[in-house]
Design a protein with these regions (language model features):
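N-terminal twin-arginine translocation
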Residues: 10-20, 30-48
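Catalytic-core regions built around general acid/base machinery
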Residues: 138-151
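Alpha-helical transmembrane segments
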Residues: 329-343
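A conserved mid-domain beta-alpha-beta active-site/ligand-binding segment of alpha/beta enzyme cores
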Residues: 210-279
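Juxtamembrane/start-of-transmembrane alpha-helix segments at the extracytoplasmic/lumenal side
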Residues: 314-326
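Cytoplasmic C-terminal tails of single-pass
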Residues: 348-360
Length: 360
């Protein structure tokens, strides 16, 4: 085989069958809502392309995005970095350190000029020349510009990289900004979340590997496959919202019955993400299923929107009177339905208490 094997050849060397490649492509295609023909093209692309060189840069971040990626179930982290991409630089996962690590980064960029993908997690410090966050004596802002210059594309993983995140919270002492504010001449895709869902990261990278292009994006540069609907759209508690049945606190009867968490601050109606469908840890659960409202962590400025437990209102950006009115109307209808139900029950009980044969 060639010294620079295709991904298909590489997988054969590792004992993977064509069936396994097709199964993985079908899974990723389903996650991204691709039509059957595109899933076949995805499988062909994965088999015929070469392993994608990835330079992963970590700036002002908490390593939560990497933590999330380690919990990817399809593909697993080891499948992703050994079979599908060549992770040539990642501070947390690489064996090398110090100058050896920086040499590896520069060598990978030179060997794959114009073909490597830069993944960034963490916001970028720009104040005072970016001195508040440096790696090997290099300011994050300078390292990003140098890496992005010859990249195929840039993927901003996590809300910090996508929108500035918590480091950009007022008063933003480090001048933290999103990757897209600095990289203006390369394709940029945002995969927000604090942290993002692992399969959204892995699926986007797999699409890049197979097609050499970004998936369809929304106005905030997020893949529509994962951020095309609000959490509210797919939430299993949505029927309770429609009926006006809400938890008023985290330990009241409504909470115990699994009612809608809108009144305790859930931001699901204005948050675009696939938490309610993909869920976390291999589809085990997501925050609302675990009893806590959505914080809106995949939306810009969620960190400066006031209390997490304050109900959405018309005074908040992104929500108008229609949605707030719907909640009020839902509550009114739900209350009316409950009143009618109680009235019907009382009438039934009164009838049951009458002596047999009493028609009065």
């Amino acid at each position: 085989m060639a010294d620079n094997p295709t991904l298909g050849e590489w997988l054969v060397r590792r004992g993977a069958s064509r069936r396994a490649v097709l199964a993985y492509a079908a899974h990723v295609g389903a996650l991204m809502a691709l039509p059957p023909a595109a899933r076949s093209a995805l499988a062909q692309g994965l088999a015929s392309t070469r392993r994608q060189s990835v330079i992963w840069l970590s700036f002002q971040e908490c390593t939560g995005c990497t933590e999330s990626l380690t919990r990817s179930f399809s593909p697993t982290l080891e499948n992703l970095i050994f079979d599908f991409i060549s992770l040539d630089y990642h501070e947390t996962l690489q064996a090398a350190s110090g100058e050896a690590a920086e040499d590896a980064r520069r060598a990978a960029m030179a060997a794959n000029k114009g073909k490597y993908v830069v993944v960034v997690d963490g916001s970028v410090s720009t104040k005072d020349g970016g001195v508040y966050s440096t790696i090997a004596g290099i300011a994050n802002v300078d390292m990003l510009r140098d890496a992005a210059k010859d990249a195929l594309a840039v993927v901003a993983v996590g809300t910090c990289a996508a929108f500035g995140g918590l480091p950009a919270a007022k008063p933003n002492p480090t001048g933290a900004v999103a990757v897209s504010e600095l990289v203006v001449d390369k394709p940029v895709v945002n995969i927000p979340g604090c942290p993002p869902i692992a399969e959204a990261v892995a699926g986007t990278l797999a699409y890049l590997v197979a097609f050499g292009a970004l998936p369809e994006l929304d106005s905030l540069r997020r893949p529509k496959a994962f951020f095309g609907e609000t959490i509210h759209d797919r939430c299993y508690r949505r029927p309770f919202y429609e009926r006006g049945l809400f938890a008023e606190g985290f330990d009241d009867e409504g909470a115990r019955r699994g009612y809608c968490l809108y009144k305790v601050g859930c931001k699901g109606p204005v948050t675009y993400n696939s938490c309610a469908t993909l869920k976390w840890n291999g589809g085990v659960s997501f925050p609302i299923q675990s009893g806590h409202g959505c914080l809106g962590c995949s939306e810009p400025d969620f960190w400066d929107q006031g209390g997490f437990y304050r109900p959405l209102s018309t005074s908040m950006p992104g929500i108008g009177p229609t949605l707030a009115g719907a909640a009020v109307a839902g509550a009114a209808l739900g209350g009316a339905a409950a009143w009618l139900s109680r009235r019907h029950l009382k009438s039934f009980q009164a009838g049951a208490d009458k002596p047999e044969g009493d028609a009065s």
